[in-house]
Amino acid sequence: ADKAASGVLTKLPQKQIQEMKEAFSMIDVDRDGFVSKDDIKAISEQLGRTPDDKELTAMLKEAPGPLNFTMFLSDKLSGTDSEETIRNAFAMFDEQENKKLNIEYIKDLLEDMGNNFNKDEMRMTFKEAPVEGGKFDYVKFTAMIKGSGEDEA
């Protein structure tokens, strides 16, 4: 996987590589070059969520090995996140476990994570999103972006 990713790196614009590095750096809290259980716990706590050890272990098991920048980049470029993986990422913030999140909370998360969305970008991001009564239905959204059309509500 490392060779394939390095080959892709030479073809990517420097700006895109830099954006990917910044995204990885936000996740790699201890800056050791790998995403660890402690990194995931720290970033979750920054976002107001405290996952237990079982949840953290389950998240790390989704990766085929230690997650370094090259592996992170390969995953992002191949777009291989499964529907379940994406749903699980949203579920981390779903304290009511009702498969819905407050849309304002999602917008705040995006702003807090340094994505620098302006109002127009934020509006466009959620223009087609399944939002009813201020609640973002992440199961429907995930099915929509992955093209499964499944509705597991």
Swiss-Prot record:
Name by which UniProt lists this protein: Myosin regulatory light chain
Annotated EF-hand domain residues: 15-50, 81-116
PTM sites of type Blocked amino end (Ala): 1
Residues annotated as binding Ca(2+): 28, 30, 32, 39
Keywords carried by this UniProt record: Calcium, Metal-binding, Motor protein, Muscle protein, Myosin, Repeat
Record flagged with keyword Calcium: yes
Function: In molluscan muscle, calcium regulation is associated with myosin rather than with actin. Muscle myosin contains two types of light chains: the catalytic light chain, essential for ATPase activity, and the regulatory light chain, a calcium-binding protein responsible for Ca(2+) dependent binding and Ca(2+) dependent Mg-ATPase activity.
InterPro entries the record matches: EF-hand-dom_pair, EF_Hand_1_Ca_BS, EF_hand_dom, Myosin_RLC
Record's GO cellular component terms: myosin complex
GO molecular function, one term: calcium ion binding
Alphabetical list of Pfam families matching this protein: EF-hand_7
SMART domains assigned to the protein according to its UniProt record, in alphabetical order: EFh
